[in-house]
């Protein structure tokens, strides 16, 4: 749904902020829909490796410097035509705003309860667009088709399988720790964790 809302043009340069489950799925759909170049910005090393393995053309660590500068260099100063903010944090929103070029579209996918600062002068002067994305049921048939044709793969996103009785300790708490590289943990009822 988010990719459709972005009105992606074939060959367009795109940035995905965040390589969690949503960001990695957006990356794959972008590649399937003909994005010309996709950069992913992600602070966690294991998630950056997943983004690279799933086809990102450039993977950046925001802790190593301002990603918008590397994006500007990689695009001869143009920056991105579309940026997907898949994190849901004020810092990621600010980074998305900087990564978008003139007349760029910033698609808000990540959720945050916090207010985010917005430089209205730059929004107007650079004619950037903010696009929200949350409803998606109309795209289920297309999503299923992308999965069936192997253009979007979910198996690489599953980084662990846990039995239902251990889902809190080995599932939820592992995801909350954010230190072990998990993307998605699959809970396996009645299997003792065996797949």
What are these regions (language model features)?
Residues 129, 135-136:
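Glycine-rich phosphate/pyrophosphate-binding beta-alpha loops
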Residues 94-98, 137, 141-195:
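C-terminal hydrophobic helical "lid"/dimerization subdomain
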Residues 15, 39, 105-108, 131, ...:
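Structural detector of well-ordered beta-strand residues that form the stable sheet scaffold
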Residues 42, 110, 134:
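Conserved acidic E/D residue at the C-terminus of a beta-strand in Rossmann-like folds
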Residues 20, 45, 90, 94, ...:
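Glycine-rich phosphate-binding loop at the start of an alpha helix
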Residues 1-64, 69:
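Mid-domain Rossmann-like dinucleotide-binding core that forms the NAD(H)/NADP(H) cofactor-binding site
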Residues 5-10, 49-129, 193-195:
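Glycine-rich cofactor phosphate-binding loops and adjacent beta1-alpha1 units
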